[in-house]
Swiss-Prot record:
Cofactor dependency: Fe cation
Record-given protein name: S-ribosylhomocysteine lyase
Cofactor note: Binds 1 Fe cation per subunit.
Keywords from the named record: Autoinducer synthesis, Iron, Lyase, Metal-binding, Quorum sensing
Gene responsible for this protein: luxS
Function: Involved in the synthesis of autoinducer 2 (AI-2) which is secreted by bacteria and is used to communicate both the cell density and the metabolic potential of the environment. The regulation of gene expression in response to changes in cell density is called quorum sensing. Catalyzes the transformation of S-ribosylhomocysteine (RHC) to homocysteine (HC) and 4,5-dihydroxy-2,3-pentadione (DPD).
GO MF entries: iron ion binding; S-ribosylhomocysteine lyase activity
Catalytic reaction(s) noted: S-(5-deoxy-D-ribos-5-yl)-L-homocysteine = (S)-4,5-dihydroxypentane-2,3-dione + L-homocysteine
Sequence similarity: Belongs to the LuxS family.
Length: 169
């Protein structure tokens, strides 16, 4: 089985909260597609609650589009990581990590303005596969933590696993 890009970086050295360019590629039509690792918490040290990350999934995707989409950037998708330590964001364009971090912080501030569970988008059995598994309180706690910590940048060259380590795994 081929080794995926996300498994070639050393998760023990990742900073969090942090932005990382996980992958850049060209579409057949020549558009730049960038995948960002938006790491909310340190791998193997912390984890986002299932209700909190699920509520963030519903809120964060819209808020990030409000703050990051523009003439040269269009978000395709923002999805939670299976390990529940963050989100992957795929987009057309190649924004700077600092711009992504700024949009992320603005989005976390937006999460804090949501007044009640009834304001969570698509929170119904028709549009959500687990519509009872939400917590605005937990999502807002995550947002407060990100705002208090600030967002740094993880660089692939600083996190790359050596061939020796990869062969030994």
């Amino acid at each position: 089985m081929p080794l995926l890009d996300s498994f070639t970086v050393d998760h023990t050295r990742m900073n969090a909260p942090a932005v990382r360019v996980a992958k850049t590629m060209k579409s057949p039509s020549g558009d730049t597609i960038t995948v960002f690792d938006l790491r909310f918490c340190a791998p193997n040290k912390d984890i986002l609650s299932e209700r909190g990350i699920h509520t963030l999934e519903h809120l964060y995707a819209g808020f990030m589009r409000n703050h990051l989409n523009g003439d040269n950037v269009e978000i395709i998708d923002i999805s939670p990581m299976g390990c529940r330590t963050g989100f992957y964001m795929s987009l057309i364009g190649s924004p700077k990590e600092a711009d992504v971090a700024e949009a992320w912080l603005a989005s976390m501030n937006d999460v804090l303005t949501v007044a009640s569970q009834s304001e969570i988008p698509e929170l119904n059995e028709y549009q959500c596969g687990t519509f009872n598994m939400h917590s605005l309180e937990q999502a807002q706690g995550i947002a407060r933590s990100i705002i208090a910590s600030g967002i740094s940048v993880n660089k692939n060259d600083e996190l790359k696993l050596s061939e020796k380590i990869l062969k030994g795994l």
